[in-house]
């Protein structure tokens, strides 16, 4: 995992991943997330404490069986899909992410904005309520910013909406200068938003031997294929493991009373997806994934990811 804070002036790396390029990787990541001309955060005078350590020998022995690789940890992982959106993601989450993507483009092109921001979308009342917080320069024209953000929201929310922009009034200090960043703090945003249960732990900072990551991807893959093949309108997959064991302890499917086929047909379909860790890693090619892509806008709902592929079954 990584900890970033201006107050500490340091970046702490604590991962079970061996690499000789920690300094390069850290600076590359910070360059993409901080405008150095805007932020009071000096990338040229950065202290980086590399505390990479070898993985526990007991864990290594449990996960290095080529024939029947065991789970790298115990845990219960979930995957979800719905036919309510083109991305098969929950509607409010889909809206908030699309707003955030457009906001990200604006932040990168507008010298008065930095890259720290949040978007929240809630619905169910007379209006869809949208809260946007985005870091800005002291001299920004807030009326102009409100107009720009309102236009972004209107392009991504079909219903009547109410926008609350920077409800604290001012958001000048952000990023590591304003708050310590820690891998795994935002696991709900990394997944499906608050309408779907959270299972396991954080995805980032883990190689695919950790089922927190690989099984969560596999659960999404299975749920999406169940919905995409029109077996159900909504689907939640839960899969649990014990460390060192290959076979899942439990695999359950909840279609929320939207199942469109006989249960036996659903079971036959599910059986086509081997949920053992080694099989998941091979099927989704998880040792050859550029995981940097998944640090923005959730790990799910991106058509180019292997776990988003609709299989020809």
Which functions belong to the PLM regions below?
Residues 234-313:
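Internal helix-turn-beta structural module
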Residues 24, 28-174, 296, 301, ...:
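Glycine-rich, mobile lid/loop segments that gate access to catalytic sites or pores
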């Amino acid at each position: 995992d990584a900890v970033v804070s201006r107050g500490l002036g340091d970046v702490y790396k604590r991962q079970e991943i061996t690499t000789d390029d920690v300094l390069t990787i850290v600076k590359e990541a910070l360059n993409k997330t901080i405008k150095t001309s805007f932020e009071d955060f000096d990338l040229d005078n950065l202290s980086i404490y590399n505390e990479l350590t070898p993985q526990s020998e007991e864990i290594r022995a449990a996960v290095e069986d080529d024939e029947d690789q065991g789970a790298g940890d115990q845990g219960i992982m979930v995957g979800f899909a719905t036919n309510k959106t083109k991305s098969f993601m929950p509607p409010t989450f889909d809206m908030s992410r699309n707003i955030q993507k457009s906001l990200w483009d604006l932040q990168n092109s507008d010298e008065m904005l930095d890259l720290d921001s949040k978007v929240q979308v809630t619905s169910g009342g007379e209006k869809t309520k949208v809260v946007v917080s985005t870091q800005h320069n002291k001299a920004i024209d807030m009326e102009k910013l409100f107009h720009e953000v309102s236009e972004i929201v209107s392009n991504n929310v079909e219903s009547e909406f109410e926008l609350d922009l920077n409800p604290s009034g001012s958001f000048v200090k952000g990023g590591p200068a304003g708050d310590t960043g820690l891998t795994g703090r935002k696991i709900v945003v990394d997944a499906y938003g608050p309408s779907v249960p959270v299972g396991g732990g954080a995805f980032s900072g883990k190689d695919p031997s950790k089922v927190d990551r690989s099984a969560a991807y596999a659960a999404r893959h299975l749920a999406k294929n169940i919905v995409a093949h029109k077996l159900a309108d909504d689907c939640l997959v839960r899969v649990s493991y014990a460390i060192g064991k290959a076979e899942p302890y439990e695999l359950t499917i909840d279609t929320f009373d939207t199942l469109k086929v006989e249960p036996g047909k659903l079971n036959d379909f599910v059986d086509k997806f081997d949920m053992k860790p080694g099989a998941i890693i091979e099927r989704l090619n998880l040792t050859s994934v550029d995981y940097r892509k998944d640090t923005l806008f959730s790990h799910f709902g991106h058509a180019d990811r292997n776990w988003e592929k609709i299989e020809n079954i």
